[in-house]
């Protein structure tokens, strides 16, 4: 009996010690304690069932099933909601680092500090690039000013400026080669020695040609010798005819007169032909003068067609050929964009936040009062620990537009519709303003909120806006002529494509 009592006392103590060890070894206190308490309850039930004997077997099975159901209920009640578990979950990298030995973790932290210093160097690199862009933009400014003057008919380029002056490219079109080639091509390097030997033969052949000309003259001289023989035969035939027809007699005095008449007839015809030619020459200028006078009289009421000044619609065509901007330009935007005289790019000054600004200069127009429309892009220039690869290049952080001072009834960014309300039973017409698709929405981008997130539609608009700003910055301002001529073909990235004057390219 004493031994049985000792066993009954020692078993619960052992189970209690085991429970304490399991609780201390586990990391999740709530779930592990629940499991330990459930295991203790099962152990107590098993110990009580062992003392009760085999007669209480069915009762023990029912108690075990009841304990499992109660355990599941406790687990469900104490389970942490999924969103909060996600919030508490640490990144995979930290979990991996936490499992490393302490000495290795210290070294990893030292590498993190080195990476922070590298990010600071990258920020200096980006600022240096910005300073270089500002420097070379000042060098390009005189060229951009000349481009502005030619487009807006303030300066007429000279003939030398209109010629293709590229040193890398040569004339290659067939027409230009035929026009510019001399009558005698210069000898090649291998043919310089052979040509002098061939030249005497050519000269000899050229000398032989005049010798043949006298032979031709001799043949021409021989022809008149045959003519008297023909005349003699004709005289003989005429004598035979005279003998055969003795009735017909001609006076010898009349024959010379007939010959004289035959000689005078060709002279008279030649004189008449010459007189007719002279009369035609005299009449042609008179007819031309009359035609020119009639044309002048007809053109008095019509204005003369003058050559266009400058390059009309230059920037309208350029923007329409830009990949992202072309679809934004509507038909009702084009008359406004015809007043666009220049698009310039300006960089922020030293000491200010890194940014660049596009200035759209407009001539006085009947649509809005602004002379310049501005769009500014702010660049991320500080390291961001949430984005470790920010230093791969420029990244636009935010953009700001400007307010357009539209004239009355000329705002193309909105449309006014009339909605009918029948709340009082009467039909009332109330105007309602609805946003409209337009290029000029480019100057009113969605604002990024300080707290919260943008809607998906606004977020997509902002992403596309950032792409447009990058294209304008990289390509359009510097190489607008290729967009005007259509050589870009509306594409942004075209590796291996050559630009320039197609007419004179090899």
Swiss-Prot record:
Record-linked SUPFAM superfamilies: NAP-like
Compositional bias per record (Acidic residues), positions renumbered to this chain: 157-178
Gene Ontology annotations for the cellular component aspect, listed alphabetically: chromatin; nucleus
UniProt xrefs under Gene3D superfamilies: 1.20.5.1500, Nucleosome assembly protein
Keywords attached to this entry: Nucleus
Compartment list: Nucleus
One function term, GO molecular function aspect: chromatin binding
Pfam family, any one: NAP
Tree of life domain: Eukaryota
UniProt-recorded name of the protein: Nucleosome assembly protein 1-like 3
Organism: Homo sapiens (Human)
Chain's gene name: NAP1L3
